[in-house]
């Protein structure tokens, strides 16, 4: 299901910002801070340094490289591009400068601007600026949507639609084995940038295994026996 897919991908991919699950407020993620212009039409995001993509065959030496502002622009430009794979243009439509024109040109298969979407600008390796058509204070909240997860161009160039089974991100876990409809095994990202409040390296776990079981009775009995640490739902046939 979409919920399960999101739960898995959320361990692999990250955005500029995300939502604090307790406070439900926007907090820094790949961007450590950002500024807003007085007219609330320009947002400037400053990326964390030392954030690396997972090691993957899509890179020339198989080693994940450092995340740069060009990567953010690449992914955000893709959201503004017409494609059967892209169902999320509505999130930026009429909002980011040049987004509508970029989408229309790509839909008509016409040459795209060399600089990409006008309102998505790389200032330097660690700074990205987004220019809007009108004041839009909730832009950071919109950017917490999974459509804005960041991946490297190399991964898209190599895998295209098969990225669903060849995920490459910056998150706390990276794919170890993916068998569609059966199981997904993630392993700890040893190079993950985040630490807890005491300075301990995250994540705490060595790995996560997601198993797909469609029979609710089997799910309940297996969970009861301790075969699973977590399940998204429990069957109502048992009152225990």
State each model region's role.
Residues 32-91, 129, 213, 219-222:
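Aromatic- and charge-enriched surface segment that lines or borders ligand/interaction sites
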Residues 17-21, 49-52, 77-85, 137, ...:
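Sec-exported extracytoplasmic/periplasmic mature domains
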Residues 1-38, 46, 168:
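N-terminal lobe/hinge region of extracytoplasmic solute-binding protein
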Residues 20-21, 101-127, 131-203, 207-209, ...:
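Gly/Pro-rich hinge or "lid" segments in bacterial periplasmic/extracellular proteins
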Residues 1-7, 30, 57-61, 87-88, ...:
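A structural "hinge/loop" feature
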Residues 228-235:
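Paired acidic/hydrophobic, glycine-rich loop segments that form the ligand-binding mouth/hinge
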Residues 9-13, 31, 69, 73-77, ...:
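Extracytoplasmic/secreted envelope proteins and their assembly/folding machinery
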Residues 1, 32, 41-45, 72-75, ...:
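Short, well-ordered beta-strand elements
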């Amino acid at each position: 299901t979409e919920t399960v897919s999101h739960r898995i991908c959320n361990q692999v991919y990250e955005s500029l910002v995300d939502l604090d699950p307790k406070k439900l407020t926007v907090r820094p993620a790949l961007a450590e801070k950002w500024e807003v212009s007085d007219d609330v039409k320009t947002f400037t995001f400053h990326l964390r340094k030392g954030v690396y993509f997972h090691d993957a065959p899509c890179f020339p030496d198989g080693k994940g490289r450092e995340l740069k502002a060009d990567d953010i622009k690449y992914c955000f430009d893709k959201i503004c591009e017409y494609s059967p794979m892209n169902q999320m243009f509505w999130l930026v439509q009429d909002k980011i400068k040049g987004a509508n024109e970029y989408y229309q040109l790509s839909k008509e298969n016409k040459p795209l601007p060399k600089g990409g979407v006008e309102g998505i600008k790389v200032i330097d390796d660690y700074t990205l600026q987004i220019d809007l058509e009108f004041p839009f204070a909730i832009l950071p909240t919109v950017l917490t949507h999974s459509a804005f997860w960041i991946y490297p161009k190399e991964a898209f160039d190599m895998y295209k639609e098969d990225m669903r089974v060849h995920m490459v991100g910056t998150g706390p876990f990276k794919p170890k084995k993916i068998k569609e409809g059966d199981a997904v095994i993630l392993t700890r990202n040893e190079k993950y940038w985040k630490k807890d409040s005491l300075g301990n390296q995250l994540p705490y776990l060595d790995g996560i295994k997601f198993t797909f079981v469609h029979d609710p009775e089997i799910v309940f009995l297996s969970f009861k026996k301790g075969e699973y640490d977590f399940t998204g739902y429990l069957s109502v046939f048992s009152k225990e």
